[in-house]
């Protein structure tokens, strides 16, 4: 699948997911290449159809994109609930376990998700896998002592790599933390790994989102299809 085909599937999923946002809602808006198409469609509906809703974003770049369309964006602490959050995912399996954080927004994404009545992910078909872990698992760590955290990950066999930008500088999250990517190839026991990571001093959050999502909208060549989590 080339990039143009992949983008077409992402766009289709984003447009389908935008239908979930209705007048008067408080909607969580995620981060990433697929969410960009979602926000474009919500912006179109706002400007052309008069859709009025309030957004809570998981990154400053999503906030900037939404506000460019005139969409009202507020801080998460200014609302008492979020009706639905629509976000992307880097991988998701049949058990609705996922990896997120490829865009370095995992902490804000998880905060918004855990305060949402409904969580929906939008992905292209390449993101649906049998076992998560092929995509590097992002872990947000504070800069102080990050080298020691990386050494601990190395000792565990996690194959950690500090994420750098195109200029060779450390990627910083919106909270000014570092991102360490774990190259695990596959994760057979995600719950155990999640507990191990979050209990590591210096770790702020990890990109394992386990059985959190209610629905996954998959961009498919035959049209968007929906995976519904029966356990939610």
From Swiss-Prot:
Stored InterPro entries: NagB/RpiA_transferase-like, Ribose5P_isomerase_typA_subgr, Ribose5P_isomerase_type_A
Keywords: Isomerase
GO cellular-component term (any): cytosol
Organism: Bifidobacterium longum subsp. infantis (strain ATCC 15697 / DSM 20088 / JCM 1222 / NCTC 11817 / S12)
EC assignment: 5.3.1.6
Pfam families found in the cross-reference section: Rib_5-P_isom_A
Transmembrane helix as UniProt keyword: no
Disulfide bonds: none
Pathway(s) where this gene product acts: Carbohydrate degradation; pentose phosphate pathway; D-ribose 5-phosphate from D-ribulose 5-phosphate (non-oxidative stage): step 1/1
Reaction(s) catalysed (UniProt annotation): aldehydo-D-ribose 5-phosphate = D-ribulose 5-phosphate
Binding site for substrate: 31-34, 87-90, 100-103, 127
UniProt GO molecular function: ribose-5-phosphate isomerase activity
Gene: rpiA
GO BP: any one term: D-ribose metabolic process
The keyword Signal is annotated on this UniProt entry: no
Subunit structure: Homodimer.
Origin: domain of life: Bacteria
Xref: Gene3D superfamilies: 3.30.70.260, 3.40.50.1360
Protein family per UniProt: Belongs to the ribose 5-phosphate isomerase family.
HAMAP family: Rib_5P_isom_A
Active site: 109
Protein name: Ribose-5-phosphate isomerase A
Enzyme class, broadest EC rank: isomerase
């Amino acid at each position: 699948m080339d990039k143009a085909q992949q983008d077409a599937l992402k766009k289709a999923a984003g447009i389908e997911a935008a239908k979930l946002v209705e007048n008067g809602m408080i909607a969580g808006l995620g981060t990433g290449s697929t969410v960009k198409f979602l926000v474009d469609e919500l912006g179109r509906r706002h400007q052309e159809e008069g859709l009025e809703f309030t957004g809570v974003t998981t990154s400053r770049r999503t906030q900037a994109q939404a506000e460019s369309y005139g969409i009202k964006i507020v801080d998460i602490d200014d609302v008492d609930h979020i009706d639905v959050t629509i976000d992307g995912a880097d991988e998701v399996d049949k058990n609705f376990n996922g990896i997120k954080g490829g865009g370095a927004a995992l902490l804000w994404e998880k905060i918004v998700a855990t305060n949402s009545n409904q969580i929906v992910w939008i992905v292209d078909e390449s993101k649906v896998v049998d076992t998560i872990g092929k995509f590097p698992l992002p872990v947000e760590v504070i800069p102080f002592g990050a080298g020691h955290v990386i050494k601990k990950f190395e000792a565990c066999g996690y194959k950690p790599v500090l994420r750098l930008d195109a200029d060779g500088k450390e990627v910083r999250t919106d909270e000014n933390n570092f991102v360490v990517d774990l190259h695990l190839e596959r994760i057979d026991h995600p719950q155990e790994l999640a507990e191990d990571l979050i209990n590591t001093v210096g770790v702020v959050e990890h990109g394992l989102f386990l059985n959190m999502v209610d629905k996954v909208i998959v961009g498919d060549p035959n049209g968007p299809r929906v995976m519904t989590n029966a356990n939610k």
